Regions:
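N-terminal soluble segments of membrane proteins
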Residues: 1-14, 68-71, 144-147
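Short, structured coil/loop segments at alpha-helix boundaries
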Residues: 2, 6, 39-40, 83, ...
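Alpha-helical transmembrane segments and their helix-start/interface "positive-inside/aromatic belt" motifs
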Residues: 5-23, 84-98
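Hydrophobic core of alpha-helical transmembrane segments in multi-pass integral membrane proteins
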Residues: 21-31, 96-108
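A structural feature that tracks compact, well-ordered secondary-structure segments
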Residues: 33-65, 72, 107-144, 148
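Membrane-helix interface/capping segments
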Residues: 68-81
Length: 152
């Protein structure tokens, strides 16, 4: 029994190692930032790293579970839908998720002083979310010659 649990844990860690390591790195930056003075180089770095690694965790998790019709970066979608609304929601779940959570970050940012310690970090997260949304939309229509992910 003990060996089965260890094997299951090992498979879980292996199968989700990118998510786990990315989240661990993000958590490390948050812990370091909690103790840091944002007016120092290290403090400013930790705050920026939180926003950057939040975007990484978003990309890793969202692209694992969600879809974006027309994006070469997205997972393949299920083929058959009987309900048009459900089809739309699933087909664009990646964009809808990033927009919905982005609105949440914007609401939080608007309630914070942008010059305060966490106001600056949340502002950077809003910027990161905007960049991710832009890339999702860009990959639907734009190409980059020589990129294996691109259509051309």
């Amino acid at each position: 029994m003990h060996t089965q649990r260890r094997s299951a844990l090992r498979h879980f860690v292996h199968d989700h190692s990118l998510t786990l390591v990315s989240a661990l790195i993000l958590g490390t930056w948050v812990i370091l930032y909690l103790q840091a003075d944002p007016q120092t180089h290290f403090g400013a770095f930790y705050g920026n790293a939180i926003a950057d690694w939040s975007g990484t965790v978003l990309i890793v998790i969202a692209t694992k579970w969600l879809f974006e019709k027309g994006s070469t970066e997205s997972r393949r979608m299920p083929r058959h839908f009987k309900n048009r609304v459900r089809e739309f929601l699933i087909s664009h779940s990646l964009t809808l998720f990033v927009v919905a959570t982005g609105i949440g970050w914007i609401v939080l940012y608007s309630a914070l002083n942008p010059m305060d310690k966490w106001g600056e970090v949340v502002g950077n997260i809003v910027s990161e979310w905007t960049q991710v949304l832009g890339m999702i939309l860009f990959t639907k229509v734009l190409i980059e010659r020589g990129s294996k992910e691109s259509r051309a």
